[in-house]
Structure formats: structure tokens, C-alpha cells
């Protein structure tokens, strides 16, 4: 029997996923979520984000939550300063990017490519383009192909309204790109492909390194398979209530869903009682 992971009693930093965690299903910040982040600051707990989104798609949240620490975009493919300056990037090789795009084409799955600060698509009316436009706050660049940016791709997303089909492609992509890419569903309809070291576990490690923070005193919260890598290395791993069972099983504790203010409840009930400053004053 595998021994349970130790859960640490002191938390000095919380790193949160965005879509499905910090935001509601309608992609909004609740008043309670904003207040929870403020309470973290008062308690001396650092707060930052790690997301599959591009940096530009996180700018409004960074401003609304007054994030003062480095954060991670593209599942860790980019480390970004709170002023949106790029600290570090890890991009797909041109071979891996080409192979993934060919795979998506063979399965008739829409591809989005993020490169040069833009979101690129070959289809303005493709599945979830309108929804992603609302979430990110900017429009895709419609292009005939991706050849001109193939050597500097930050992320490829396979997009489908057939989740079972996309899950099958996920497994095929992992076999095809083993050692060359990180392949994970960021939700049931989006398959993210990034540099092999661009995952949320590496991102949290890098953020802690930049801050001089202790991983054992770091809490993380998320809802999808791309969050499991950070669950495995943090001192406290929290899964959202609507997360798939396998994701919940990888966490230490489960909060309520993002439709039920699960983020703010996790802060109040799980993180703040472990706040480093509060414990130091006891």
C-alpha cells in the first residue's frame, strides 16, 4: 500500500488554476473570490496564478486581484512578471508542433496555435472560438496555416465538441510525442500541447525558486488533469468539487465546485487556518 502524502500545517503561498477553479462556469470572478484573495494578503500568504491561458488572457485577472508575484501562462510554458514582462519561455520544437498539427488534422480536430503573443486559428467559426474570445478578451488571428510560426509555438490546443474523441487523441498524442511535449486536457474539450517541461508542477517549482519560497509551504488548487503535476509537488493540494474523480484522488483535500464558490471556501477553510503569519503569532 502506498503511504499517504504528508500534508503540511503551515502555508505561505497559494497558487491557483484559473478556469474551473478561480472563475465560475460563466468565467467570472465572484465577490467572495476577490475578498478571499484580499484576506490572503492580510494574513501574509502570497497568491499567484498558473493557467493554460496565454499571458494576455490573464492580464485582467492579474489587475483585478492585484497579483504582485510572478505567474505562469501556457501551463508553465511562460513565466510572467505582474507587469506582464516575460521572465522565461519554453516553446515546442518545430518537429513536435508539426507532428501534433498533423495528428489533429488526421482526426479532423480543430487546432489553435499560440505564438508571437497571438491566438491563431484557421476557422473563425470553429467550435468554442466565441467562448474563448469572451474568456481571453481578444480575438483570434485567422490564418490559412501555421507554417510561418512553427518554430516558435508556445502552445497548441486541439478543440472538439466530442470529448470522448479528444480523450482518445490525447492518448495517441502522448505516445507520438513522448519526451517531446506535455499533453493534457485542460478541460473536456481542450487538449493542450506544450514544451515537455511546460507543466504546472515545473511552473510552481519555478515560481517558488524565484520567490525563495518553500514548496512544502505552498498550497495549490485546480480542477483538471493538467493540475495533477502541481498537486504532486506542493505541500497542500486542493481539488475542486467538479473535478474528475482521478484528479480528486490526486489531491489531499476536495473543496466544493466552482459553481459553489469552492475557491473562496478553500481559502477560508483550508488555507487561512494554515497561514504562516497567523501561526507565527499564536
Mark where each language-model region is.
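Mg2+-dependent phosphoryl-transfer enzymes with acidic/Ser/Thr/Gly-rich catalytic loops
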Residues: 3-13, 29-30, 192-282
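Conserved acidic, metal-coordinating active-site core of Asp-based
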Residues: 107-221, 225-233, 242
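Active-site residues of response regulator receiver
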Residues: 17
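Short, structured coil segments at secondary-structure junctions
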Residues: 65-67, 74-75, 177-179, 233-234, ...
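Active-site phosphate-binding/coordination module
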Residues: 26-130
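Hydrophobic packing residues within well-ordered alpha-helices of enzyme cores
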Residues: 33, 58-62, 169, 173, ...
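A generic structural signal for well-ordered alpha-helical segments
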Residues: 40, 62, 104, 174-176, ...
Amino acid at each position: 500500500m502506498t503511504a499517504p502524502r504528508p500534508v503540511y500545517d503551515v502555508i505561505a503561498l497559494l497558487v491557483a488554476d484559473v478556469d474551473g477553479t478561480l472563475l465560475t462556469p460563466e468565467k467570472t470572478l465572484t465577490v467572495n473570490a476577490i475578498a478571499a484573495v484580499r484576506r490572503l494578503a492580510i494574513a501574509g500568504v502570497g497568491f499567484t496564478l498558473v493557467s493554460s491561458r496565454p499571458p494576455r488572457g490573464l492580464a485582467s485577472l492579474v489587475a483585478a486581484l492585484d497579483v504582485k508575484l510572478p505567474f505562469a501562462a501556457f501551463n508553465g510554458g511562460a513565466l510572467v512578471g505582474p507587469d506582464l514582462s516575460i521572465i522565461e519561455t519554453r516553446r515546442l520544437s518545430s518537429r513536435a508542433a508539426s507532428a501534433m498539427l498533423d495528428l489533429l488534422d488526421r482526426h479532423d480536430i480543430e487546432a489553435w496555435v499560440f505564438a508571437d503573443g497571438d491566438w491563431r486559428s484557421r476557422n473563425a467559426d470553429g467550435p468554442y472560438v466565441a467562448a474563448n474570445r469572451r474568456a481571453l478578451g481578444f480575438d483570434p488571428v485567422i490564418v490559412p496555416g501555421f507554417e510561418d510560426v512553427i518554430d516558435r509555438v508556445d502552445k497548441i490546443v486541439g478543440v472538439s465538441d466530442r470529448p470522448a474523441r479528444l480523450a482518445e487523441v490525447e492518448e495517441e498524442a502522448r505516445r507520438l510525442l513522448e519526451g517531446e511535449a506535455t499533453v493534457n486536457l485542460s478541460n473536456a474539450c481542450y487538449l493542450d500541447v506544450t514544451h515537455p517541461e511546460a507543466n504546472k508542477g515545473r511552473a510552481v517549482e519555478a515560481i517558488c525558486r524565484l520567490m525563495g519560497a518553500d514548496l512544502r509551504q505552498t498550497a495549490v488548487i485546480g480542477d483538471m488533469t493538467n493540475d495533477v503535476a502541481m498537486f504532486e509537488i506542493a505541500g497542500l493540494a486542493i481539488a475542486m468539487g467538479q473535478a474528475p474523480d482521478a484528479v480528486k484522488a490526486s489531491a489531499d483535500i476536495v473543496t466544493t465546485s466552482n459553481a459553489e464558490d469552492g475557491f473562496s471556501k478553500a481559502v477560508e477553510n483550508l488555507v487561512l487556518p494554515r497561514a504562516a503569519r497567523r501561526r507565527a503569532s499564536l
